[in-house]
Amino acid sequence: MIIGIGSDLIDIRRVEKSIERFGTRFTERCFTDIERAKSEGRKNKAASYAKRFAAKEACSKALGTGLAQGVFWRDMGVVNLPSGKPTMQLTGGAARRLAAMLPENHRAAIHLTITDDFPLAQAFVIIEALPIAG
């Protein structure tokens, strides 16, 4: 069953300006080590960071908290499954919020899609509760 849905749309130029203005202070505050390594290796760093920023916003909306109630930027990170499919890895307050949302004897599956088409980046997150086979 679906227990959370979130979406976000962001202007890549806004993220680019934040990177230019604040540099690593911005990227280290908002992004995990994995996200920074992935984005720094990209030709268009701003678009890569913008997609991940949108994913965090969408995930926080799917959690029903936004960036509040103990959910912080670095509690949510975009990671890739072995297949290459992106998903969200949650820690800290985001992981605690997700655990509180889950019905008993269920596990979470977080579905993520991210895209960009300059000047926009977009993300959708669906959080699904799946029964644990017993």
UniProtKB/Swiss-Prot annotation:
InterPro entries: 4-PPantetheinyl_Trfase_dom, 4-PPantetheinyl_Trfase_dom_sf, ACPS, Ppantetheine-prot_Trfase_dom. Belongs to the P-Pant transferase superfamily. AcpS family. It is found in: Cytoplasm. Its main location: cytoplasm. SUPFAM superfamilies: 4'-phosphopantetheinyl transferase (SSF56214). Its cofactor is Mg(2+). The keyword Flavoprotein does not apply. It comes from Rhizobium rhizogenes (strain K84 / ATCC BAA-868). Its EC number is 2.7.8.7. It catalyses: apo-[ACP] + CoA = holo-[ACP] + adenosine 3',5'-bisphosphate + H(+). Pfam families: ACPS (PF01648). This is Holo-[acyl-carrier-protein] synthase.
